[in-house]
Amino acid sequence: MSQTDITVILTVYNQRPESIETSMRSVAAQTGCTYQLLVADDHSSESFEDEATALASELGISNFTYVRHPENVQTVRNILHALPYAEGQFIKPLGAGDALYDESTLAAIVAFCRDNDVHAGF
């Protein structure tokens, strides 16, 4: 079994850095489970990797990965491209600029999936 409960795949494509930061802060606030934050860049015109890596460190996100697709492939294929880098037992896609509801959102998803033998969901 994976040691990481859930991977959040944060999809980005030419978003403002402030939008990406909003989402990253929302993930960093999570408690009650282990998570990986995986930023999946769909070949934005400018890479945000250095800034995202620095912010992840500042926020205390220890399990952080940034992957950049070599060409723009749209959201679904961007997520599919990121999946091999995911370490979590479960996956939660999140669009840049979106935030999780509260600090226990990921823990609630993990608990629900485990309690109900969920293998896939949206």
Where are these regions (language model features)?
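Nucleotide-sugar donor-binding/catalytic module of glycosyltransferases
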Residues: 1-122
